[in-house]
Structure formats: structure tokens, C-alpha cells
């Protein structure tokens, strides 16, 4: 559906991440999701962000017992924060970042006191927004 439209309601991304958080909890990982979304966002950026989350989760599933997602979307930006309990510092590979960076997004990571913090920010609209 996303590939056939240029813009999506931000609630579609919110609901997708919420369902993913519920699915992760089935595997014994404490997973919380908070959001504040409004407006429409680029379908291409939605796909890239959800792909990023999926690959990230696959990498950390076996080395965490708690995840926190915080999604904020408004007419200008998509901000995603992920906090992950992890005894091992995880480096996010360049290929995982490629789709986000190609779309003008920024990803930063910090590791402190057994917690990995991931911050993703990108414009919410298309290339001209």
C-alpha cells in the first residue's frame, strides 16, 4: 500500500511500530512504545524507517531484555528514539543506516551505563518539504 502512495497518515507508522512492540513482548523482552503523531509523512521515509527498526531489532533480540520506542511525528519531522538495555555496546552497521541517510535522515547513537540510545531524525515530507 505504501508504495502506491506518496504520503501516508502518520498513524499508519505509529500502529505498525505499536504492533511490532507487542510482538517483541511475546519473546520475553519488555517493550514499551510511546508516541505523539499527527499529519502525513512520506511513504518512502516510512518504509525506510520501519525497515531500519526491523533490522535493528533482529540485531539486538538476543542481547537485550528491554526496549523503549518513542515516536514523534509532526508536519516537519519524524523523530524516533530507541532505548535498549544491552550489556554489550552495539555498533550500527553502515548498511543499516544507508536508507535513512539517503533520504536525508540523521542517526546518532550513544552507549552509557549498559543502555544503547539510538536517535533517528528525518523530515516528515517528501524531498521538497
List each model region and its residues.
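Short beta-to-alpha transition helix within the HATPase_c
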Residues: 1-27
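Conserved NTPase motor "head" modules and their coupling/switch loops across ABC/AAA+ ATPases, GTPases
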Residues: 20-32, 40, 67-72
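Conserved short strand/loop->alpha-helix "switch" segment adjacent to the catalytic nucleotide/phosphoryl-transfer site
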Residues: 28-55, 76-78
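Short beta-strand/loop element within the Bergerat-fold HATPase_c
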Residues: 68-78, 111-112
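Conserved DxG motif in ATP/Mg2+-binding regions
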Residues: 78-88, 120
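C-terminal beta-strand of the catalytic ATP-binding
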Residues: 119-126
